[in-house]
């Protein structure tokens, strides 16, 4: 998992250490008018790499309303555009989780795991404010969309699905 902000002083250095498609994607997203973009899923091609841009208007909710998720074919680049904050928790895929809903063979490329109380001991946590991004690789189980102690908040977020194969 990688965390950063497209507006901070170190953005160029942070982006430069990423695989080429992710670096290009961050620069592209930073230059787009995402606040006024239509919601939905859109195909996007950068340097010959086919990606999927998802633009969503959502509301955060408590941790127990979410299930841990993972992807295998895509790297998830999640960027908070406005609103929030949006809390993400994450932990490594150690192969011990119980599958609740496997949709890896669908275009959504998503698998949900059962919530387990013991994962709370190993979950990392980041709080996304506008401009913050989190990048999740296939080994990063993540739980986005959570509210902070102040309760549910509306937010707009981007999820850009970048093929893992393009990042190798």
Give the positions of each predicted feature.
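A short, N-terminal "cap"/entry segment at the start of jelly-roll beta-barrel domains
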Residues: 1-55, 65-70
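Conserved short histidine dyad/triad with adjacent acidic residue
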Residues: 53-71, 81, 85-98, 138
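Short, conserved beta-strand element in jelly-roll/cupin
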Residues: 72-86, 92-94, 103-118, 161-162
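Short, structured patches in soluble enzyme cores that scaffold and shape functional sites
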Residues: 79-81, 138-140, 146, 160-164
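Short, solvent-exposed loop/turn positions at domain surfaces
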Residues: 122-123
